[in-house]
Amino acid sequence: MALTLEALAARFGGEIVGDGRCEVRALAPLDQAGPRQLAFLANPKYLAQVETTGAGAVLIAPGDLEKLGAAAHGRNFIVTPNPYAYFARVAQMFIDLAAPPRAAGVHPSATIDPAAQVAASAVIGPHVTVEAGAVIGERAQLDANVFVGRGTRIGDDSHLYPNVAIYHGCTLGPRAIVHSGAVIGSDGFGFAPDFVGEGDARTGAWVKIPQVGGVKVGPDVEIGANTTIDRGAMADTVIDECVKIDNLVQIGHNCRIGAYTVIAGCAGIAGSTTIGKHCMIGGAVGIAGHVTLGDYVIVTAKSGVSKSLPKAGIYTSAFPAVEHGDWNRSAALVRNLDKLRDRIKALETALAAREGDAGGA
């Protein structure tokens, strides 16, 4: 389906520069776009590509359009303060237009407990299981092999992709998106040590602590593939509104993730940790348990957080990649820091003694 720039601006805003009747059918990168495609400039370092792009129109920020000067003549633009966000909204619209909603109903192979409540407008795919007391909201879509445990509530307009498992006693707010393989509500990692003795004479066991809380997920949350969110030990694990979680993230029991926070892939967050609003957690970050991150905290990739970070800011503890030889030299220096410290102390002591002797003379 083709849409004019005028139609896009009427829906999403922005100022048209050029021909508002220009029609676009899809989006594409600046260096690949054709005359029926819409491109966007989010990073000024690619400004030169705007001069050569074949795109029918470009989403651009006001300042970048000014930098183009005469090169903008004869081209079509939608000028907006945030071209990247504008692009995202247009892309979602094109997807919605290309893939109309599936027909409501329950697939014959699905297993729905008679005590469950499934909205008539919901879409229940093949081999889905919905246990007793579960509630599936209006227009929710559960794809093949989804499991929804007893008493769990799935909000309106949510989409659970194939092979998602939502354990008992959990809540997903409206418009939640949960990707394949994600598990929400599995037991938190809670074991009480009950050992006596020392060494080889030590006897006893780890005693499992029942995890009787749930997981509460707010509205407009997206959870990536193969991500796991543990249920609380006594109170709920809470994921606040508009949180976006990447693939392969582990969130321990009793954590609370503040609204609008984003968490990149392979991050691990130990139990009872609180992360504030509008935080950004980089890939492979490890966060210890029982710590608190304040609002607007950014932790860069592969950093380890072992204590609370209450103040907004950017935090890094990862060692950036360097050439192999440089790393070996740095590692050798680190291994010998204690010897270097002892030598410096000895030199300082000798220097102090010499200065003392000179003063006495």
Curated annotation (Swiss-Prot):
**What family is this?**
Belongs to the transferase hexapeptide repeat family. LpxD subfamily.
Organism name? Burkholderia pseudomallei (strain 1710b)
What are the UniProt keywords, alphabetically?
Answer: Acyltransferase, Lipid A biosynthesis, Lipid biosynthesis, Lipid metabolism, Repeat, Transferase
> What biological function has been recorded for the protein in this entry?
Catalyzes the N-acylation of UDP-3-O-acylglucosamine using 3-hydroxyacyl-ACP as the acyl donor. Is involved in the biosynthesis of lipid A, a phosphorylated glycolipid that anchors the lipopolysaccharide to the outer membrane of the cell.
Listed under catalytic activity are: a UDP-3-O-[(3R)-3-hydroxyacyl]-alpha-D-glucosamine + a (3R)-hydroxyacyl-[ACP] = a UDP-2-N,3-O-bis[(3R)-3-hydroxyacyl]-alpha-D-glucosamine + holo-[ACP] + H(+)
Alphabetized HAMAP family for the sequence: LpxD
Q: What is its EC number?
A: 2.3.1.191
GO terms classed as biological process: lipid A biosynthetic process
Q: Which residues form the signal peptide?
A: none
Q: What is this protein called?
A: UDP-3-O-acylglucosamine N-acyltransferase
> Has keyword Coiled coil?
no
Q: Which GO terms describe its molecular function?
A: N-acyltransferase activity
